[in-house]
């Protein structure tokens, strides 16, 4: 999407053109909340950050002058607890929600850099207490099959976490690990000695059916991320991870944001407008435009946002990582960031 352009004054005093997104994604490419929260909120206060295009290496600038909403993505968003109040300070009116990937691969050691599961569940609950219901979405992503993990193992892992999150979230998003489609993932798993197993359609259906049965005690919205397979017969829908409907529900009082999304907010009495959905008691939204991001994968439902992260910068060291070419590349960039932690770039250079 072509965002509006503004001019910024860089740290070195130079003037530069920058795109000024209304919705920011932080980030699909790295774990900003876990490792770069201090950097991000510093750059938010400065007013801009630099971003390098992963396809052509061209550096550009992102201004936060027009930002009204942030979608955070993380496996360990605990550092956000110290910063969330800044979204509403210094004249800002920025709302957010968190896509919280809360997996359990502790026994198998697939996510060596994340905190213990109990700590991550505690963080989830603290964030909900801070932000309110609907602001923290549970992701178990990806669902991986290996010589040590079968479908029943995954279901037990999901059930354990799902039981503990009841009352703290209303949604579970998941995906089946499609390893063959991602060369980096395949290479990382093979180099780390993980004997993975590709999902077949029968296993996908088996998992979906059993998950649907488990969900009778939770009543979560179940959704897949970027999946071609249709399993709606089990009450599982295709997700929008950057979700205009959720953004509208959480920030319907923000007229600038609603105008951008093409959402008209109405108080209702006996008559309810056609094709509307409830955002609060007695308040509905009617959308007049489709906001799907054409730059995402074919089966991705996300709306347009500006991602500000960069690949090869996440030190979680997950064995199946799609965002790092190698562990060494990520650690090298992380060390470089620590030498210059508030640089305009996430890598410190």
Predicted regions: what they are:
Residues 202-298:
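A C-terminal junction/extension of Radical SAM enzymes
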Residues 77-78, 103-105, 143-145, 179, ...:
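Short, solvent-exposed loop/turn segments at secondary-structure junctions
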Residues 297-326:
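Local cysteine-cluster metal-coordination motifs and their immediate loop/turn environment
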Residues 174, 191-212:
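Substrate-binding surface in catalytic domains of secreted glycosidases
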Residues 1-111, 117-133, 325-349:
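Conserved Radical SAM active-site core
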Residues 119-186, 207-227:
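Conserved C-terminal portion of the radical SAM core fold
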Residues 106-114, 142-152, 190-199:
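Surface-exposed cleft-lining segments at the edges of enzyme active sites
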């Amino acid at each position: 999407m072509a965002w509006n352009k503004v001019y910024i004054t860089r740290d070195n005093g130079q003037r530069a053109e920058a795109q000024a997104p209304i919705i920011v994604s932080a980030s699909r490419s790295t774990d900003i909340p876990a490792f770069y929260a201090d950097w991000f909120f510093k750059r938010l206060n400065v007013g801009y950050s630099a971003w390098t295009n992963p396809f052509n290496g061209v550096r550009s600038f992102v201004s936060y002058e027009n930002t009204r909403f942030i979608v955070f993505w993380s496996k360990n968003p605990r550092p956000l607890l110290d910063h969330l109040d800044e979204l509403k300070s210094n004249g800002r009116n920025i709302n957010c929600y968190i896509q919280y990937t809360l997996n359990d691969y502790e026994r198998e050691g697939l996510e060596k850099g994340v905190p213990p599961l109990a700590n991550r569940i505690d963080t989830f609950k603290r964030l909900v207490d801070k932000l309110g219901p609907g602001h923290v979405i549970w992701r178990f992503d990806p669902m991986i099959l290996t010589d040590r993990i079968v479908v029943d193992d995954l279901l037990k892992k999901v059930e354990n976490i799902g039981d503990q999150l009841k009352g703290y979230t209303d949604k579970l998003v998941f995906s089946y690990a499609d390893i063959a489609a991602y060369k980096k993932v395949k290479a990382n798993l093979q180099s780390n000695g993980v004997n993975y197993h590709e999902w077949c359609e029968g296993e996908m259906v088996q998992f979906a059916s059993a998950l649907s049965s488990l969900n009778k005690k939770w009543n979560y919205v179940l959704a897949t991320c970027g999946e071609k397979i249709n399993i709606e017969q089990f009450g599982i829908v295709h997700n929008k991870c950057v979700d205009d409907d959720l953004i509208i529900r959480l920030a319907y009082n923000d007229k600038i944001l609603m105008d951008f999304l093409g959402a008209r907010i109405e108080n209702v009495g006996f008559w309810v407008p056609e094709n509307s959905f409830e955002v609060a008691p007695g308040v509905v939204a009617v959308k007049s435009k489709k906001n799907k991001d054409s730059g995402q994968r074919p089966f991705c439902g996300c709306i347009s946002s500006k991602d500000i992260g960069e690949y090869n910068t996440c030190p979680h060291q997950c064995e199946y990582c799609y965002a790092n070419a190698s562990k060494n590349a990520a650690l090298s960039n992380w060390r470089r960031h620590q030498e210059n932690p508030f640089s305009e770039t996430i890598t410190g250079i």
